[in-house]
Amino acid sequence: MMGWNTVERNWKELKGKLKETWGDMTDDELDVIAGKREQLVGKIQTKYEIAREEAERQVNAFAHDCDAAKEPLKNVGEAVSSRQKSVKKRSLYT
């Protein structure tokens, strides 16, 4: 599962997805938040006038969705890496 540290490290790449999820967020607000989970939760809570628990739930769902989207790519990467190792082994024996 993608931890929040991974979301934070990939913040710039995820900005588009963040804006899709929370359309009222500005680029400037997202730049200030810069991947800090508690700041994102607080901003969602105040901007959308929702309970903190709901903001937490939304942020957790976002991280989970990012995780689910990256999982197939991870599997493809592992398959490619495995295939490359297999090809290298065969070329050593030919």
Swiss-Prot record:
Disulfide bonds: none annotated. SUPFAM superfamilies: Hypothetical protein YjbJ. Pfam families: CsbD. Residues 85-94 have a biased composition (Basic residues). Residues 74-94 are annotated as: Disordered. Signal peptide: none annotated. InterPro entries: CsbD, UPF0337_stress_rsp, YjbJ_sf. Belongs to the UPF0337 (CsbD) family. This is UPF0337 protein NE2439. It comes from Nitrosomonas europaea (strain ATCC 19718 / CIP 103999 / KCTC 2705 / NBRC 14298).
